A protein has these predicted regions:
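Mid-to-C-terminal functional-domain signal that highlights helix-capping/loop sites
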Residues: 1-179
Length: 179
C-alpha cells in the first residue's frame, strides 16, 4: 500500500479470488412501487429510509448479483449486500465520501467482505464502514450507517407506500426473475 495509510496490518487483508467480485449498480433509476410489476408480494427485499425520509427497497433477487449499489439524490447512500451473512448494510455518503464509488474488491478482512472506492483507491470494511487502507484525506472517517429492514415486498409497501425500488432493467444482461 505505497502512499497509503493502514488502520489494520496489511497482511490481515486476504485475496478471496474473483468469485467475490460483482459489478456494482451506479445510480439506478429507481421505480415507484406501482412501476415495480416484476415484484410479487412475498419477494424478499431490504428496505431503508434515507436521511431525507425517502424509503427505498432493494430486492434480494437484484442485489445478490451486484452486492454494491450507489444511490444518488437528496441523500446519497451506498447499499452493500453481504452474501455470507445474507444481510445488507447501508451507509450515507457525505463529506469526504460524497463522491466515492464503491465496488466489491475480492478481498477479505477477518473473514468479512472488503469494498473498494474507485476514486481514492481505498479499501473499506463493509461491516464497520471504516477505511482499512486509505489516503490521509480519509483519516478518521467512518461511514454513517442507516438502519436496514429485511422483509417482504408486500410488508414494505404497506409500511412505505411511496417507496422507490431498484429497477429490473439495470443495464446488465441478467435474468433477475430466476433468483
Amino acid at each position: 500500500a505505497i502512499g497509503k495509510s493502514c488502520s489494520v496490518a496489511p497482511h490481515e487483508i486476504h485475496w478471496a479470488g474473483p468469485k467475490y467480485y460483482s459489478a456494482p449498480l451506479r445510480n439506478p433509476q429507481l421505480l415507484s412501487a406501482a412501476q415495480a410489476s416484476y415484484l410479487v408480494p412475498n419477494d424478499l427485499v431490504f428496505g431503508i429510509v434515507d436521511k431525507s425520509g425517502a424509503a427505498i427497497a432493494f430486492p434480494l433477487r437484484i442485489i445478490t448479483w451486484h452486492h454494491v449499489v450507489d444511490v444518488e439524490g437528496h441523500s446519497p447512500l451506498t447499499a452493500l449486500y453481504d452474501e455470507q451473512n445474507k444481510s445488507m448494510l447501508a451507509y450515507v455518503r457525505s463529506g469526504p465520501t460524497l463522491h466515492c464509488k464503491y465496488s466489491s474488491s475480492s478481498f477479505l478482512y477477518s473473514g468479512e467482505h472488503v469494498i473498494s472506492d474507485e476514486q481514492t483507491h481505498s479499501l473499506w470494511s463493509a461491516r464497520t464502514g471504516r477505511p482499512l487502507v486509505y489516503d490521509q484525506s480519509l483519516q478518521g472517517v467512518q461511514l454513517q450507517a442507516l438502519p436496514v429492514v429485511a422483509t417482504t415486498w408486500a410488508a414494505w409497501v404497506k409500511e412505505h407506500p411511496t417507496t422507490k425500488v431498484l429497477p429490473i432493467e439495470t443495464g446488465f444482461d441478467r435474468d433477475y426473475r430466476s433468483r
